[in-house]
Every structure is written in C-alpha cells, then in structure tokens.
Amino acid sequence: MYRTYKKFKKPGILLREKYSLVGVSRREGSGYSRLSADFELSKRWQTQNGLIIRGTGNVLTAAYLENNSTTRGYLLKVYPLGALELKYPLFRGKNERSEVLMPIAQIVYSTDTSSTTNPIDEDSSTTEFDSTTLFKLRKIPGIDRQEKGLRLNAGLQYFYEHKNNYKYT
C-alpha cells in the first residue's frame, strides 16, 4: 500500500492519495487481482465567528481481473463521494484548565457508478460504527462494498485540559 499527503500553497487545501495492489488465488474456484486508487481533495475554511467548514471530494476506484480456469473477466468499480462538515468550537478557560465543546454536523453523499450488482466480495463488508468512526467518510473497511446514498452524521466532541498535563477527550 502506498499513501501520500500533499498540502498546497493555498492554506487549508489537502490532497490525499492511496494505492494498493492485491492478488488472491485459490486451489479451487477463481482468483482475482485488484488494483485500487483512492484520491481525496479537501478544503478547510474558518469564518470570523469561529465556524470551521470543510468540503471534501473523494473518488475510490478498483479494477479487477478475474482469473478463472475457463474464463477471464474484467470489472471496474468507481465510488465518488462528496462531503460537507461544519464544526463550531465553544471554548471556556479558567485558571489552570480549559474546556472545548464542539458540535459537529457532516453531510455525505456517495454512489456506485459501476454497471454490475455482483461485485467480487472478498473484503470485510461489515460496517464499523462506533465513536471513533462516526465522522469517517467511509465506514466499511473493505473496497468491495461502500455505503451509498445521502447521510447525516451529527455529534459532540469535548476536550478538557488541565495545566498539569491532565487531558480528557
């Protein structure tokens, strides 16, 4: 797997790239090879009153070559995704401590542009959903299946820090 992160000269713009090559073979049945690429471009703004806005565009692609003893097949999957995230940090500091309460709202839309409804399904297709994945754009860890449609994620983050390096999140 190969990953890169690139910040542009304009502040707040970030490009992320990730590539991987996977090959699966079996004694019985068919095997396949997969080449995938994941591109993400995001831009962050902050308004004068402290509202943090982040827009994100992402395209995940996967090209499959099925290696069967009798046939050979090709499949291309493309998963475009767009997201808008709003955060509004509320800060309170007093003497030796500081607290931040941050409401977060995220709206995400994704779709599957491939023509087939029977993808090769070798990766985990179970959605990982807990407090650490709530604001992840893709909650299914594998590439074979992705969430589709419009969804809204909302929550709160709380940070507490004491002068003596005591932190609570």
Which residues fall in each region the model found?
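Outer-membrane beta-barrel translocator/pore domains, especially the C-terminal barrels
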Residues: 1-169
